[in-house]
Amino acid sequence: MSPPISPTPPPLQPPFPPTAIARGPDRPDPPPQHQQAAESLVNAAAQHVAPTCPPTSDELPQMEDQATNSSNDSLIPSRQAPDQEETENAITAGTPPDEMEPTKDAQTVRFSSSSPASYSTHEYPTEGINEPRTSSRAPNTASSQMAESSCDFRSSRDIGSIRMGASALVSALNALPWEEDDDSDDGEDDDEFIEPARGSSSTIYERKQRPQTPSTSHGFHPTHTLHFPFRQNAIARRACQPGTTELDYQYATPETSSRRTSAAGSESSSEGEVPLPKGFVSHPNLIVPSGEGEAAAHPDPKLISDRITKEQQIADVEEQAEILRSAEEQEMRLGKEFVPPKSRDSADLNVDAALREGGSEREDVIEEQMQTNEAEKRLTRNEKLAERLMEVFGLEEREEVLEEMKCWLLRSVMLKGYMYLTKRHICFFANMPNENNLLVKSGPLHKKASRSKLNTKFWVVLKNDVLSWYESTSDPYFPKGNISLQYCHSCDAVSGTRFKVRTSERNYTFTADTESSRDEWVKAIQKVMFKTQHEGETIKLIIPLEAIVDVEKSPTLEFTETIEVKCIDAEDQMSVDSYFFASFPDNDYAFSAIQKLVRERPSPPELPRISSVTTIHANQEPLDTSHATIKRHGTDSSAEKLGMASHRPFRKISSVLKPLILKSSDGEPLEEHSQGPHHNDEDASHLPHIEAISNRRRSEEESDNDYFDGYPPRQVGPPPPSMNDDARNWRPSWIRKPASKLFGSSPSGSFVSHPGRLPTDSSTTVTESGPSLRSRTGRTKQASVTEVMEPPIQYEEEVSEDEMSNKPSVVDSNSAETARKRAARLSWTSETSSGSQMVKSKSDFSMLGSESGHSESAETVRKFRTFFALSDKEELIDHFPGYLYRVLPVSGRFFISTNYFCFRSSQLLYKTKESFRLMIIPIRDLYGLKAQKAFRFGHSGLTVVIKGHEEIFIEFRSASRRKACIALLEERMEAVRLSGENTIVDSHKIEARIMEDLDESTPVEPKSPWPVSPSPLFGSTTSTSFLEFKPEPMKITCLTIGSRGDVQPYIALCKGLQAEGHITKIATHGEYKAWVEGHGIAFESVGGDPAELMQMCVDNGMFTVSFLKEGLQKFRGWLDDLLNSSWEACQGSDLLIESPSAMSGIHVAEALRIPYYRAFTMPWTRTRAYPHAFAVPEHGRGGPYNYMTYTMFDQVFWRAISGQVNRWRRNVLGLDATTFDKMEQHKVPFLYNFSPTVVPPPLDWTEWIHVTGYWFLDKADEKQGEKSWTPPQGLVDFIDKAHGEEKKVVYIGFGSIVVSDPEEMTRCVVEAVVNSGVCAILSKGWSDRGSKKGEPKGDSEGADGVKYPPEIFAIDSIDHGWLFPRIDAACHHGGAGTTGASLRAGIPTIIKPFFGDQAFWAERVESLNVGSSIRRLTSHQLASALIKATTDEKQISKARVVGEMIRKENGITRAIEAIYRDLEYAKSIIKSLPSTDDRTPERISSHLHPLTTADLSFNRVRSRSRSRSRSSQGRFSPRRHTVDDDGWSVVSGGSRSRSGSASAVTSPERRPLNIGSALGSHVFKTALLPNTFGKWRNLEEGDDR
């Protein structure tokens, strides 16, 4: 509410000159209140000070003289009194708002009308006039309070320090349309005068400086800067950009003014009239120009125009500067580079935050410190979003965006995009990903051979758009075969776990391990096919509200609720298309918003119809136009709206999996040639008729074509005449496509288009020429859903032959040839498939050393791309014959292209080299080239060094070929390094960002370089591998024992799981409690002393005979304590992750009936690729030995603990005794927390075994609430000093190892450091744990009686993550965590293994050539290893490459994804609890093969099992009668307990109450989970294995 208007304000004596207040017969007296208020403001402007109190009688003559002088020299701004200049400078400096408090004696002057009647007559809303809320610079003034109360120029509300020249304020007031203004908005309520922030719908213009010519008789008004806040303001709008009406008004003659005034007085209430501010009274002679003549009133128009243009340019510059300064503060994203300001629309412009300083050389912008107004921020964003929505979707007019929501569009693929709700449309926008070097999926699959029909297991990799298979995961450059998904027809699941990939030439059959794995592969391949065949395209879906039939919720997905929008098909009124949207931020809110929008949609006459080329005959039989691409020539208003997308052809894709192409009777695809603009109007006006005839002819000729799928029925007879009439006079507003499904077949369309990559994949091309197709007046078209798929723009330097054919001048034989080539691309026969790539290489590279001396032929390029499955963008530069050495030389030909170095063997029948007949190496992976002597006489050798791979040896018959090959490869290596990423601006990325740059949500999470599914587009729709899906928060327990290195990875994993919302707990040894809880993780203690365990392992070796004998004596009680404490620690868990070394997890999970995972730091699953980590030989012994080590270890390990474990199962867990085979440990999901770069996954591992990458824990020693870790004093100086002396710094430490002779080890280390000439950082760590009490311990000066030289800096412990990147090499014991840390830092690693898995990591480091292994620690061997690690450039470079690859991994993220993916599988293998009733039927074997035989009772099976067990024990265990149930033996393993009671059903009395007592027969039957992997093993097979 505005303040009350004082009816009788105190009289004021305004200091106006006599000329300004002279009255005559033609100048009636204005109302005194109005005059006094206005004159106070104008007087303040004349003196360039804030309004002050009225002048006294002594000051009045001086004021009159000044006013007279300035009136005479009104056109000369430089004539100002010196005191005025001083005042101006003082005011320009500014007065803080907090100093501008009015005193008590300040007088208040208010505007008021002369009478209530006149006030009501002229009570107009003043939109925008209340902004900006400027503060007066002079305190204690009546004028200041008058302005605050009347004009709402309040002093400091929502703004900071504001400088404002009063003259500019008056200029802004003069710019207001006091008379009729056609550009003004309609009046609104007076409430907006009080709250301008809510009424922010006024149009905003940028500033234009007004000409400095007098418009009133008040004399000269000096121009100065008016600093407004960065917000919408009507005053600034008129001052910045005066319209023609305003200029005519201000510079009009008295006669014109009188005429306008009288007209305004007679039509004061007319619609569209801009009212006066509240309190002002319209008067005919209020602002009549002075009588200085018409010359003064009419300045030179050219001068005015030039001044306005100049001020417009200055305002543009200042506005952009202010926008850039305040964009970050106000959180505005303007997208400047995407929407160039070609035309300045009033709705897109903001008021200048600062106006130009008139006559001043300084044109800086003063930043305004103010709080962000959220309402204005949303309004500004919505305005920009509406503009961009009109640009991107090509809407005919700007529509206000009511809602903006992220969601998914569900079809055969799931597209993530944005939904926009307007009053007339539902719009959806998605951008197809365009990423290179993207690993989509990899894993083992069986491939069926084409001739032998045998299945061979390969490691299959889906990368980019190529599906390749390899014999080994460690040989990524020699694929056995590949498939380019760009030319694939389909990928479908067949019977069992098989699926087929179909191409034009042959079919490929693959077999997965499980059906879920098969489905994931099919989904991944299908989505890559779609992405590849529509790379870089944008998907736009426009649903008019009048086409919507119903909106309802639909449980389409098993893990989320979808919203189904049903739309009527404009082509066929009997069919309804459904569009499914899911994964809204709030599904209920989105559903209610869409429903509300549909309910409140305007009536049909109010909605503009969305025209479509296929809806002109909506009531007739639908014609197939799915292959039609309609293009127009000339200009169009709609094309201007579309902007950069207006010249692109649109394609509507109906199906991805069924690329069927229509053919004519002669087998050639139909194509109508484009009509150029030289055709007459009669021909052009019948183009839609031509389209209809073409479609009808296709429909008739397809009677014998098997591509027809039977629905809808074929059209019979010619189209009705009404359709032709409609086609002649109708012109679409912009190019649209029919309403059929984008990715799935629609009931209204019987044919599907080929999902090719080219932008002109169409069998019918219709060109709209000029303005021949006119819009029909008075007739509306039925709205249809528009689906547009826009191909990427090809730049001028990459104009394709298809684009050339669409030019107007091409209507000759060349066009026919181009059409034939384009049709060949669409055909899927073997001949035309090959022809689809027959595009001449446009290589501009030099043909160095080329035998032919010219560029390669199109046929050679085609074969090259086809054989190596490369894209059409890959250009062949040259090729050479030569030999590739693996074991023996393999003859073939080497190919060099823009990005690849390839080899193809010519010895196709040479079976021993079959695996090496194909080589594809990316040039970016080449590290170097080196010429060398050949192995054979008369040849020239070449060594190719590859990053992260072994060297490759090549031979040529002549030195000239080798020289040419080296020159080309070096040229391409340099070009690839310099080019980096493509810098060409992708228009579709721009358009995608146009819709996404205004998104206010959180930033996108960084993608994992080794993702299970790199983006949601490639995620499976199943709930276990869909990345957007997260299970409900769970209580997850991690169970592990061992050293610090065994516990640390679980801390990292638990922190990642906590970030996902889960509750985590670690159960391990009690000495780690403070460390674990310091990271905010719950802790449970389990039994066992890790120091004693390590001492025994070091003394006896891992699982040797002496180790087992000592274990029989010492660790029987240790194992019982471990088992019981593990059971107690895991209570209340929803999911269990265990290290296999804990030995109890699988039994605890079975008793708790919870999903169970295993995780370990070394290989534990049987494979032929690597030996067991506890049985690594000094030299490799091959696959059979490796597999045998796992079998032997599993059997021995189980025999050693089975007696105690089975007794614990019966007495504590209430479970039956088990065997090694019954546990089925090979079916348990496994997470290996080491890098696939270091240990590539073997082919014989199943899909639920994941090599995730290292689980690094940065700053492991830090605790919550404590300050960050700092290095020991002097360590940084030691490292810097060594590097300054050009010495290498190495780390030597054996952290968690108990050394039997620490004195000898210390002396050996010191001698090796001195002899190698390096500086060392020595950490003994836990080496003192095994020492006896009372022995002296080491310090920084020495230890074990050995004095440290200056080259050694001794520490107790160190953060490896901090230290390793600062040094040159590391020597340690080879623990999994320490090895991962040194490899991650990219430094050579020396390992001295002591026990356990350390020998395995030493072997891997040596195999990768990133370090050395020392089997026996001597000073000589250690010194040699240190010298090699610090001087061998090959080893240093290889370690650097491996470090880069490891740093790109995200092991924790991949581990969590694997947990989600296999969660359902882990639940499916949970074993059922035993029955409490002998009459309970035997458990079913599988949900696929249930046992239905009624005569198989549990008693009969149990008796057979018991008899067989006893007979087995009679043969193999003669001591069965002398061994007690509680006895423990490695050989017998408690045989009597297993034979006597292992298979017997435990009575309810012997079970814990919380497990067995509540279980009845019915509960047991209903609680059974199906076993997906075949039948359960029959109990009669016996208990012992």
UniProtKB/Swiss-Prot annotation:
The encoding gene: ATG26
Function statement: Sterol glycosyltransferase responsible for the glycosylation of ergosterol to form ergosterol-glucoside.
Species of provenance: Cryptococcus neoformans var. neoformans serotype D (strain JEC21 / ATCC MYA-565) (Filobasidiella neoformans)
Residue sites binding UDP-alpha-D-glucose per the record: 1043-1044, 1046, 1358, 1360, 1373, 1377-1378, 1397-1398
Bias (Polar residues) ranges: 65-77, 105-123, 132-148, 760-785, 806-817, 827-840
Recorded GO MF terms: sterol 3-beta-glucosyltransferase activity; UDP-glycosyltransferase activity
Compositional bias of kind Basic and acidic residues: 670-689
Catalytic activity: a sterol + UDP-alpha-D-glucose = a sterol 3-beta-D-glucoside + UDP + H(+); ergosterol + UDP-alpha-D-glucose = ergosteryl 3-beta-D-glucoside + UDP + H(+)
Major location (coarse): cytoplasm
Name of protein: Sterol 3-beta-glucosyltransferase
Pfam family, one: GRAM
Similarity remark: Belongs to the glycosyltransferase 28 family.
Subcellular locations according to the entry: Cytoplasm; Membrane
GO cellular component: cytoplasm; membrane
SUPFAM superfamilies given in the database record: PH domain-like (SSF50729), UDP-Glycosyltransferase/glycogen phosphorylase (SSF53756)
Gene3D superfamilies reported for this sequence: Glycogen Phosphorylase B, Pleckstrin-homology domain (PH domain)/Phosphotyrosine-binding domain (PTB)
GO biological process: carbohydrate metabolic process; lipid glycosylation; sterol biosynthetic process; sterol metabolic process
Ranges of compositional bias, category Pro residues: 1-18
Domain annotation GRAM: ranges: 387-555, 862-933
Compositionally biased intervals (Low complexity): 255-273, 1529-1545
Enzyme class, UniProt record, top EC level: transferase
PROSITE patterns recorded: PH_DOMAIN
